[in-house]
């Protein structure tokens, strides 16, 4: 499995890459769920658990990459006329990404629970008491012990073996990695929430500026219209005055000419 590194800032390509990654995350989550369903069955092997870990880490990397792409998409330059359409597109991608992440985190939690149950069984069968280190407080936030509500595994009278120790260490390492990855997904959820809030503020500011500019243009047009009307009235008044003066001069001319005659 592999994931694609960063791409250019073309909006169409970036949106396509985000959609493609979201689809991959959804498909990988379904594949992880199918693998989880095989645990505890005759198909459960170390190779299967290794495959599960690889699928989970690959999907986690896809989620981080998609988070980065969505951030880039939100800050691409755009014109005011394109801004609303860009926001609608981004909101749709964020909603789809959130749904895919929610499903992925669900199977992550299931995987962590299965690993803990496995370690608990190995410890019980090997007469090893206790759970996990006291400082592993993060695990308590994500993993619930189903064994607390189920009958305890019968303890067998045998000492712990090197194979048991190796299995316990491997599974504990896998649990720590799973819970670190779950924390990564939680951080992505926080990023998505912040991006939605910031994007909304930017859109509101741009729309307010556009509306303000439209008001100023309308006011300027009104002022120009009033000035044009005033100019037309002034010209009309001037023409009337000139006409009156001409008529007056003609009348005076005839009066003077009549007196001379």
Swiss-Prot record:
Tissues expressed in: Detected in all tissues tested. Highest expression is found in kidney followed by lung, spleen, heart and brain. Lower expression, in skeletal muscle, liver and testis.
Residues carrying N-acetylserine: 2
InterPro entries the UniProt entry points to: SNARE, Syntaxin, Syntaxin/epimorphin_CS, Syntaxin_N, T_SNARE_dom
Originating organism: Rattus norvegicus
Subunit structure: Interacts with VPS11, VPS16 and VPS18. Interacts with VPS33A. Forms a SNARE complex with VTI1B, STX8 and VAMP8 which functions in the homotypic fusion of late endosomes. Component of the SNARE complex composed of STX7, STX8, VAMP7 and VTI1B that is required for heterotypic fusion of late endosomes with lysosomes. Interacts with TPC1.
Gene designation per UniProt: Stx7
Topology term for the membrane: Single-pass type IV membrane protein
Protein name stated in the entry: Syntaxin-7
Alphabetized Gene3D superfamilies for the sequence: 1.20.5.110, 1.20.58.70
Family: Belongs to the syntaxin family.
Entry function: May be involved in protein trafficking from the plasma membrane to the early endosome (EE) as well as in homotypic fusion of endocytic organelles. Mediates the endocytic trafficking from early endosomes to late endosomes and lysosomes.
Record region (Disordered): 128-148
Example of a GO cellular component annotation carried by this entry: lysosome
Coiled-coil residues: 47-68
């Amino acid at each position: 499995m592999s994931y694609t590194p960063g791409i250019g800032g073309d909006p169409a390509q970036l949106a396509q890459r985000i959609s493609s990654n979201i689809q991959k995350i959804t498909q990988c989550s379904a594949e992880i769920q199918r693998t989880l369903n095989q645990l505890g069955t005759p198909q459960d092997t170390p190779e299967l658990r290794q495959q599960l870990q690889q699928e989970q880490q690959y999907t986690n990397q896809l989620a981080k990459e998609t988070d980065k792409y969505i951030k880039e998409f939100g800050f691409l330059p755009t014109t005011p006329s394109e801004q609303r359409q860009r926001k609608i597109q981004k909101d749709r991608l964020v909603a789809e990404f959130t749904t895919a992440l929610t499903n992925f985190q669900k199977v992550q939690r299931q995987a962590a629970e299965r690993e803990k149950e496995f370690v608990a069984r190995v410890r019980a069968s090997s007469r090893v008491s206790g759970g996990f280190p006291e400082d592993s407080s993060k695990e308590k936030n994500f993993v619930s012990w189903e064994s607390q509500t189920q009958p305890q595994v019968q303890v067998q009278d045998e000492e712990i073996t090197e194979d048991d120790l190796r299995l316990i260490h491997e599974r504990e390492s896998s649990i720590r990695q799973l819970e670190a990855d779950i924390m990564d997904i939680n951080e992505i959820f926080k990023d998505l929430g912040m991006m939605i809030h910031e994007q909304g503020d930017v859109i509101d500011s741009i729309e307010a500026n556009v509306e303000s500019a439209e008001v100023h243009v309308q006011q300027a047009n009104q002022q120009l219209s009033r000035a044009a009307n005033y100019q037309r009235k002034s010209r009309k008044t001037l023409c009337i005055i000139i006409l009156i003066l001409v008529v007056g001069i003609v009348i005076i001319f005839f009066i003077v000419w009549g007196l001379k005659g």
